[in-house]
Amino acid sequence: MINQAAIMAWKDNAPWVHAAMVEQDLIICKALVCIFGDEFLASQLAFRGGTALHKLYLTPQQRYSEDIDLVQIHPGPIKPILLRLGEVLSWLPDKVTKQKRYNNTMLFRMESEVPPVQPLRLKVEINCYEHFCVLGLQKVPFKVSNPWFDGECKITTYALDELVGTKLRALYQRKKGRDLFDLQVALQSGNLNVARVLECYQRYMEFVVDKVPTYKQYVQNMEEKMQDHEFLGDMDLLLREDAGRFYPTEAYKQVRAAFIEQLPGKRE
């Protein structure tokens, strides 16, 4: 789908370990321009998740990310959005749409162009139930300049503090070391308002659970993960080629001091 010269040219923007990852990164970037360059989709969808953090705020991108996470801004029928999304992404092959009550997913499958040939999969997932925003939606300029594709748009997304607040929720909810990495990088950017991050975390956590985890529950959750090999090794192949190692123990110390120690609950 993409000539090898264009993929290699993109490596300056996406210095990932494998050429297939560079190719996927370029595909993601074109897809973002196609989605948010469309007036209808830009008014209906907001970009969220790790890919949004690294593509829009934590630049240059510190880790590889393979999916596009979107949120339906307003409650309403999802079918018109899915139809238009399929149209603007019609250049991607083998589309499969999976619909559930709270999220809808489009999967595209292809093979990499640079040997050794590897299967590639792009997942575009739409959260269809969190129709709210704490700090207001943002419009962030985004540009792709490559021999294969050249384009730009303004991406509808959330404020940095809100994206990081949802990351703090994700760190508790799932077992992926990349969430810990993202929080550390966000802290090191020096651009965070920790009080606003915690406000957003509280709002998003309240939306999905009856009782927000206490300080003690969050610490226990993290201490279990810090003994889990899958969690600790999640970042092994996701770092830039020119990056140093990721040290989860040090990252946890920083994230705990900045965020977790501010959570309500007894200290024992």
Placement of each model-derived feature along the sequence:
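Glycine-rich beta-strand-to-loop/alpha-helix junction loops that act as flexible
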Residues: 47-52
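Structured mid-to-C-terminal alpha-helical surface segments
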Residues: 1-45, 56-63, 68, 72-268
